[in-house]
Structures are given as C-alpha cells and as structure tokens.
C-alpha cells in the first residue's frame, strides 16, 4: 500500500508541474504577443532591445527550462506507458534527456553568450 501512495504523490507532482510550466509558457506567450502588437511593425533594434534586458533574459531562460521540464514529464510518461522493454525505454529516456540538456545549453549560449 505504501508503494501506491508514493506513486500517486509522484503522479500528482508531475500533474502539478505540468500545469505550472504550461501557465508560465502561456504568460510568456501573451507577453510576447502583446509586445509585438504594441510595437507593430517591429524592427530588429526593438526586438534586440527587449532581449537585451537582464530580466527578459532570465524570464526567457526560466520559460525555456519550464518547457523542457514539461516535455520531459510528457516523454517520460509516454515511455513508461507504452515502451515495456526496459533497455529500450532506458535508451529512449537517455536520448531525450541528452537532447533536452543540449537544448538548454544551446538556449543559455544563445541568450547569454551570442552577440
């Protein structure tokens, strides 16, 4: 019985995290859409100025991290539900994890290092 409780808590946590990450993504999308509508037609200097602010870089990085976390929970759930062969599931999970980490590193490079 104890095992069922731990599983249900993890399921609830995953459900909750997906709702929070979706909310963050939605807030970010609304902000960007409003910015685009207010500054129509937008120029490159305006776009660059928006993403040059420290707060926007931090917010963008948080949203990217939350999207990747959201994706990880979704892919983990799909693999757990549909891939019954454990070595194949582990290989797929490892591949997805490496890709998501790579995407996050790429986002950091794009936001903070690239000029």
UniProtKB/Swiss-Prot annotation:
CDD domains per record: SQR_TypeC_SdhD
* Cofactor(s) it depends on: heme
Q: Name one GO biological process term.
A: cytochrome complex assembly
Name the keywords, alphabetized.
Answer: Cell inner membrane, Cell membrane, Electron transport, Heme, Iron, Membrane, Metal-binding, Transmembrane, Transmembrane helix, Transport, Tricarboxylic acid cycle
Residues that, per the record, bind a ubiquinone: 82
Cytoplasmic topological domain ranges are: 1-14, 80-89
What name does this protein carry? Succinate dehydrogenase hydrophobic membrane anchor subunit
Pathway field of the UniProt record reads: Carbohydrate metabolism; tricarboxylic acid cycle
- Primary location class: membrane
**What is a single cellular component term in the Gene Ontology annotation?**
plasma membrane
Ranges of the Periplasmic topological domain: 36-57
Which InterPro entries would you find in this protein's record? SQR/QFR_C/D, Succ_DH_anchor, SuccDH_FuR_B_TM-su
Q: Name one Pfam family in it.
A: Sdh_cyt
Q: So what does this one do?
A: Membrane-anchoring subunit of succinate dehydrogenase (SDH).
Q: Identify its membrane topology class.
A: Multi-pass membrane protein
